[in-house]
Amino acid sequence: MFDVLMYLFETYIHTEAELRVDQDKLEQDLTDAGFEREDIYNALLWLEKLADYQEGLAEPMQLASDPLSMRIYTPEECERLDASCRGFLLFLEQIQVLNLETREMVIERVLALDNAEFELDDLKWVILMVLFNIPGCENAYQQMEELLFEVNEGMLH
């Protein structure tokens, strides 16, 4: 499913291609690209749930309103998000790329993924997808994009 999400993000969203694509055509394009129907269905469902945040139909769980509070992760969250992922989320909060709400959206979307392996690079892409879809997060999205791509470019020098 995560491969389908990455393909969709890079092909349709990140490239600013036509965003209004017929779902049947999209499913056919994904099938033609070699993705399994179940993965396609799960990815589209994942994106629907993300769109619920955008449309105000869903809100992230509010655990604390004090910005100085520390997020304690559940065992399930710790299993999916290793120490480097949790540290990266904290770093993004400290530099104000994520706020309490967007952090919870990211965590919820990570837990909704069905892949067994989940790494820091995967988290970065989920963060980009969440920030891209949330109104008012354009600056945070741009900062995250710069962080993601500058780090990779810096490695080439």
UniProtKB/Swiss-Prot annotation:
Any Pfam family hit: DUF494
InterPro entries, per the entry: Smg
Signal peptide feature range: none
UniProt similarity note: Belongs to the Smg family.
Protein name per UniProt: Protein Smg
Source organism per UniProt: Escherichia coli (strain K12)
